[in-house]
């Protein structure tokens, strides 16, 4: 459960530019 949430958060962070 937690792993899925962490993966989703990481994907969102990677998709959005972190300038």
From Swiss-Prot:
Keywords: Toxin-antitoxin system. Disruption phenotype: None seen. An isbE overproducing strain cannot be made in the absence of the sibE gene. It holds the Pfam family Ibs_toxin. GO terms for biological process: programmed cell death. It comes from the Bacteria. Induction: The sibE sRNA probably represses expression of ibsE mRNA, either by destabilizing the transcript and/or preventing its translation. Expression of the proteinaceous toxin is controlled by antisense sRNA SibE. Belongs to the Ibs toxic protein family. Part of the SIBe repeat region, encoded on the opposite strand from the sibE RNA. Toxic component of a type I toxin-antitoxin (TA) system. Overexpression causes cessation of growth. This is Small toxic protein IbsE. It comes from Escherichia coli (strain K12). The lineage of its organism: Bacteria, Pseudomonadati, Pseudomonadota, Gammaproteobacteria, Enterobacterales. The gene is ibsE.
